[in-house]
């Protein structure tokens, strides 16, 4: 990007971008089901102690690679070299595979609310089969061009935000007016039970507070430079943390956490609110269902091809075959998108085999999505630790405090993430076969494949090319 286009984003613009990238009402539902009111303080702590420092870590990498518009591959390469840069970029795509498995059943549930006015209860087998058909359709649409999806998704996302804020306002009004909450709001209810199961669910909180990598890239584009960026990110983190916490406190005013479902929880809480205020419940179900369905279906169609396109545009040529990465007339690597479809199929089938209900299925899928989502930030944190420990001399306009401060902060984050990742990979009460073949097996196979692919790639390079590829900061001008 040219210098004339730099410093064009105002503080409010960055605040809006940050909010859009991080906050999601569905995250409130998911964590409320697992943690109840204890999710309220955990959301606030996660945004303060994870989101803000991780944003600053990314901002420092962006500052180090200020002459590059590339993303995570360039950031990690500047500290750990090409192999770990490829592994990290690969894990970002890899996480999206699990994201699809958790998104598809929600699309189906919200379609049911939108067109029927209620959630049609299906078995895990039926849900999985319909999800596979839906994902095949979304892959076909996304590879054949979906130009109108952006504006549609933007409008429905805005409507969902307005619905969320209206719920918070009306639920708060009802609470002040003397309504008896479905779940009592007490200090004791907000104190987490610090056990192994809780440690595993904390990854759900961290996943909800994610999005730093999509915001921190604007550090060079903000009016006022890095100082303004830091101020806005801290303010945004506090604001989002408070909003998540307030949402978590108010989510059970009308509906108990025990009654909420992963698939249609958003509609359930609005249904409860409509019943309290005497609004037409069926109409509310259809409206919230339609907005949620449109937003999620649009997101599904857009994200089916986008991660593949980003991944193959970042990594060096030659790691994957030319036909695999070849773009079609719509600028999408169609063959890679269909390979992605084939990979997602077993990721949907395996957890289905160990689930008695759709709620069990969603629990397994979301848990694994959260566990997998820990890997990319963890690799970036390790890269940052190496940057501050061994390469702190490299010139950059922005640093997250002194060398010692940076090392201490990132070391604490690495420790928390490592424990959370292990706890969510080996959850209590889970089917042992599901853990072995899905949780552990999936990660080992995918990361092992990435390691093998990169090793095969560097064998075809000259000695000089291997040296450049392996050397940290070789991409930093």
Swiss-Prot record:
Pfam family membership, one: AA_permease_2
The entry's keywords: Cell inner membrane, Cell membrane, Membrane, Transmembrane, Transmembrane helix, Transport
Location in or out of the cell: Cell inner membrane
Periplasmic side: 1-8, 63-83, 142-158, 218-232, 285-286, 357-364, 427-431
Cytoplasmic side: 30-41, 105-120, 180-196, 254-263, 308-335, 386-405, 453-477
Membrane topology: Multi-pass membrane protein
Domain of life assignment: Bacteria
Stretch forming the signal peptide: none
Membrane-crossing segments per the record: 9-29, 42-62, 84-104, 121-141, 159-179, 197-217, 233-253, 264-284, 287-307, 336-356, 365-385, 406-426, 432-452
GO cellular component: plasma membrane
Listed GO MF terms: transmembrane transporter activity
InterPro entries (alphabetical): AA/rel_permease1, APC_superfamily
Cited PANTHER family: AMINO ACID TRANSPORTER-RELATED, GLUTAMATE_GAMMA-AMINOBUTYRATE ANTIPORTER-RELATED
Family: Belongs to the amino acid-polyamine-organocation (APC) superfamily.
Protein name: Inner membrane transporter YgjI
Organism of origin: Escherichia coli (strain K12)
Gene: ygjI
């Amino acid at each position: 990007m040219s210098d004339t286009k730099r410093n064009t984003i105002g503080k409010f613009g960055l605040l809006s971008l940050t909010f859009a990238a991080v906050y999601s009402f569905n995250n409130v539902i998911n964590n409320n089901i697992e943690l109840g009111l204890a999710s309220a303080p955990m959301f606030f702590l996660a945004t303060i102690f994870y989101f803000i420092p991780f944003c600053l870590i990314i901002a420092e990498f962006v500052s180090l690679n200020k002459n590059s518009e590339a993303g995570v591959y360039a950031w990690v390469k500047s500290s750990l070299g090409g192999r770990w840069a490829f592994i990290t970029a690969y894990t970002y795509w890899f996480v999206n595979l699990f994201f699809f498995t958790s998104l598809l059943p929600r699309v189906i549930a919200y379609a049911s609310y939108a067109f029927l006015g209620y959630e049609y209860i299906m078995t895990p087998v039926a849900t999985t089969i319909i999800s596979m058909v839906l994902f095949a359709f979304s892959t076909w649409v996304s590879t054949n061009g979906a130009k109108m999806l952006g504006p549609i998704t933007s409008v429905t996302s805005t409507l969902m935000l307005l619905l969320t804020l209206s719920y918070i306002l009306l639920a708060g009004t009802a609470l002040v007016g003397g309504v008896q909450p479905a779940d009592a709001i007490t200090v004791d209810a907000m104190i987490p039970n610090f056990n192994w199961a809780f440690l595993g669910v904390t990854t759900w909180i961290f996943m909800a507070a994610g999005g730093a990598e999509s915001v921190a890239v604007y550090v060079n584009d903000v009016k006022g430079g890095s100082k303004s960026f830091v101020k806005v990110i801290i303010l945004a983190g506090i604001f989002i943390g408070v909003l998540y916490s307030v949402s978590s406190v108010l989510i059970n005013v009308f509906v108990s956490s025990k009654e909420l479902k992963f698939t249609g929880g958003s509609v359930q809480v609005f249904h409860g609110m409509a019943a309290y205020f005497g609004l037409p419940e069926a109409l509310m179900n259809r409206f919230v269902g339609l907005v949620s369905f449109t937003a999620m279906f649009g997101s599904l169609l857009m994200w089916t091809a986008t991660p593949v396109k980003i991944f193959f545009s970042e990594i060096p040529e030659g790691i994957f075959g030319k036909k695999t990465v070849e773009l079609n007339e719509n600028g999408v690597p169609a063959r890679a998108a269909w390979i992605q479809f084939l990979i997602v199929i077993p990721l949907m089938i395996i957890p289905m085999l160990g689930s008695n209900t759709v709620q069990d299925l969603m629990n397994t899928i979301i848990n694994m999505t959260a566990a997998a989502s820990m890997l990319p930030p963890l690799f970036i944190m390790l890269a940052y630790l190496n940057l501050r420990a061994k390469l702190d001399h490299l010139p950059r306009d922005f640093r997250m405090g002194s060398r010692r401060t940076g090392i201490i902060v990132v070391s604490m984050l690495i420790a928390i993430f490592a424990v959370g990742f292990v706890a969510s990979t080996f959850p209590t009460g889970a089917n042992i076969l599901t853990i072995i073949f899905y949780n552990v097996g999936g990660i080992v196979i995918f990361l092992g494949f990435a390691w093998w692919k990169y090793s095969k790639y560097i064998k075809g390079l000259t000695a000089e090319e291997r040296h450049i590829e392996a050397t940290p900061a070789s991409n930093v001008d």
